[in-house]
């Protein structure tokens, strides 16, 4: 669970959503819980936990939350790819094979970022954050 103190709350929401997946209040509370938990995990440097939290929001029938989760996943993947490249940079001249392997990992994360952001753009083409982030990801993939 992303936030231990609220395990019972989340379990109740999950059970409720199984019975009534269109219940707007439960969808909103569940989505908001996992968006906040994902952002908190991201700030704490727990990227995997953040990714898991954001992914729980994607299936929900809530345009704004889904867009925010996809955007957050895109940023998370982009940052991960950038960190992989940064750590691999010193290897570029000393160990070309290892650098190439790390660059391939980074490119995979950039591709994931692009996929998430493009999906977010389809759902909410007006979203300014998505519009700003997409060209950055595309530029780094050239």
How should these model regions be labeled?
Residues 1-6:
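Conserved small/polar residues in nucleotide/adenosyl-binding loops
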Residues 24, 31, 38-45, 74, ...:
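Short coil/turn linking the two alpha-helices of tandem helical-hairpin repeats
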């Amino acid at each position: 669970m992303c936030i231990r103190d609220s395990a019972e709350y989340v379990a109740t929401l999950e059970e409720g959503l199984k019975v009534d997946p269109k219940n707007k209040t439960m969808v909103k509370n569940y989505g908001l819980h996992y968006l906040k938990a994902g952002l908190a995990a991201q700030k704490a440097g727990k990227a995997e936990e953040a990714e898991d939290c954001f992914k729980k929001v994607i299936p929900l029938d809530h345009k704004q939350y889904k867009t925010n989760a996809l955007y957050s996943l895109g940023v998370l993947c982009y940052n991960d790819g950038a960190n992989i490249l940064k750590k691999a940079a010193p290897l570029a001249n000393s160990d070309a094979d290892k650098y190439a392997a790390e660059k391939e990992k980074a490119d995979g994360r950039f591709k994931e970022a692009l996929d998430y952001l493009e999906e977010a753009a389809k759902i909410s083409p007006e979203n300014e954050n998505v519009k700003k982030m997409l060209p950055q990801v595309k530029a780094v993939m050239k």
